[in-house]
A protein has these predicted regions:
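PTP/DSP superfamily signal
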Residues: 1-22, 28, 36, 48, ...
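Conserved SAM/SAH-binding loop-helix junction
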Residues: 281
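Short, solvent-exposed polar/charged micro-motifs at secondary-structure junctions
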Residues: 27-30, 253
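Conserved G/P- and acidic residue-centered "switch" motifs that form tight phosphate/ATP-binding loops
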Residues: 278
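Fold-level signal for large, globular catalytic cores of enzyme and receptor domains
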Residues: 174-183, 188-195, 200-247, 251-273, ...
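Surface-exposed beta-strand-to-loop junctions
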Residues: 35-44, 75-77, 236-240
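Acidic/glycine-enriched edge-of-secondary-structure segments
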Residues: 25, 35-59, 186-198, 245
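A composition-driven signal for long, intrinsically disordered, charge-rich low-complexity tracts
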Residues: 38-40, 64, 224
């Protein structure tokens, strides 16, 4: 890297950390140490989407960069994160180095991104996971603000995050589930009535989820898609179940919003929410709740949701959440700064008026009049096919490095920011007591029918242990 190229690099930490896009891979020098993650931390696309990189990959990057900055062997060198000029790689690389500043250095999103303001060419905005044209632009700043809010509400704690367990449960063969608001909302793919789906691919049944949900204090399941299993299979195992169906790929009608709020505000335990793929309808309703109860801005929530569960919130649902932001903030303000878990009749009426007002203002572009038929099934198929291809978000080299240095995931504490509370994440840390569920990773070609047996790395896997 020439002095001219260094002059064009973005200085993140004065005289120490830099970011730059280069046409060719540079060699280390006496003064500079270079590294790239373009071929190491990989986004797994559904269709034309390419980022942002997931929470687990964000965490791994932060650990990687932190180690380099603390490495005595390069303590006198400039650390330079370089990427190629591919627009997708540039966006993901810039997101990561900014995320490091938010997560590890404690900077606000605006301060972290400030060195990149005015960069040319501008960064490519992230898009949704639909097949068609995407008019909504999810920016790097949206994602950084999402991280900032997630940390503020203690939904993510860098010091106690269990990355191995997070990556385990987000795999299709291990349940396809992610915490969006840890301890309050878990998003997951719709359970199957049988242990294999129509294509013969291994699938999770209600009975597979039950022991995991019980261990994680998930006491209620909300189904948003058409019936594909008997809800009694959850109820008989002591987990409540509610149906709130609305059209695939659509935005929720007013009555669904009101029912969802009433149910969730009266449920002290954690809630598992799913549609077909657990991405669009699921993320949209959780987003409305987050705006109302946590004043989580819509654009930031979309960024956060996609970091937690890639592919979430699609098509018209994106702009819909933005249009609902003011109304949800107002609805939350009616309930007070610290929302009470039970809605009085007058508060329910006030919320209904807010939602109705928006519905009249927006006309036919929102609500349940739009349906993307088969969207959920397409998304599920994309994930299944990636699993069959053996796609992994870590490169082979990094997989070997992680396996050599990995320690077995352990149960511990996790932030109470959403443990049945609606106080914006304030509270003490709660220690999990109880037995972990041993869970064997699912072999796509060999179905494991019961949650028993040791995991690959010898540690017990716990949904509740992901965040500490």
């Amino acid at each position: 890297m020439t002095e001219r190229e260094l002059a064009e690099a973005i200085e993140v930490i004065p005289e120490r950390l830099y970011w730059v896009a280069l046409h060719t891979a540079p060699k280390n020098t006496l003064k500079s140490h270079y590294f790239s993650i373009d071929d190491e931390l990989l986004y797994e696309p559904f269709f034309a989407d390419f980022g942002p990189l997931s929470l687990s990959l964000t965490y791994r990057y932060c650990k990687l960069l932190e180690a380099k900055l603390n490495d005595a062997a390069v303590s006198e060198k400039r650390i330079i994160h370089y990427c190629g000029h591919d627009s997708k790689n540039r966006a993901n690389a810039a997101y990561l180095i900014c995320a490091y500043q938010v997560v590890v250095m404690g900077k606000l999103a605006e301060a972290a991104y400030e060195p990149f303001c005015g960069i040319y060419p501008p960064f490519l905005a992230f898009r949704d996971a639909t097949c068609g044209i995407c008019s909504y632009k999810c920016t790097i700043m949206d994602c950084l603000k999402g991280l900032e809010y997630g940390i503020q509400y203690r939904w993510f704690d860098y010091n106690c995050f269990d990355v191995d367990t997070c990556e385990f449960f987000e795999k299709v063969e291990n349940g396809d589930m992610n915490w969006v608001a840890p301890g309050k909302f878990l998003a997951f793919a719709g359970p199957s009535a049988t242990s294999t789906d129509n294509d013969g691919f291994p699938a999770f049944t209600p009975e597979d989820y039950v022991p995991l949900f019980k261990e994680a204090a998930i006491r209620l399941v909300v189904r948003l898609n058409r019936k594909q299993y008997d809800r009694q299979r959850f109820i008989d195992q002591g987990i409540k179940h509610v149906d709130l169906y609305f059209l695939d790929g659509s935005c929720p009608p007013n009555d669904i919003i009101n029912k969802f709020f009433h149910i969730c505000e009266n449920e002290p335990g954690a809630i598992g929410v799913h549609c077909k793929a657990g991405l669009g309808r699921t993320g949209t309703l959780i987003g409305l709740y987050a705006m109302k109860h946590f004043r989580f801005p819509a654009r930031a929530f979309i960024g956060w949701n996609r970091i937690c569960r890639p592919g979430s919130i699609l098509g018209p649902q994106q702009q819909y959440l933005c249009d609902m932001e003011v109304d949800m903030f107002q609805a939350g303000a009616v309930m007070g700064k610290i929302p009470h878990p039970f809605m009085a009749a007058d508060l329910e009426k006030a919320l209904a008026l807010q939602v109705e007002k928006l519905s009249v203002r927006d006309g036919p572009n929102h609500g349940d009049q739009f349906e993307d038929v088969g969207q959920g099934e397409r998304l599920c198929n994309a994930k299944r096919h990636a699993t069959l291809r053996g796609v992994d978000v870590l490169s082979p080299n990094l997989q070997q490095h992680q396996s050599r240095n990995a320690t077995p995931p352990q149960l511990g504490t996790f932030p109470i920011g959403a443990s049945g509370r609606t106080d914006g994440g304030r509270g003490v840390v709660n220690r999990l007591s109880g037995n972990a569920t041993n869970w064997k990773p699912q072999d796509p070609l060999s179905r494991q029918t019961s949650p028993s047996g040791g995991v690959a790395n010898g540690g017990a896997k716990s949904l509740r242990g992901i965040f500490g």
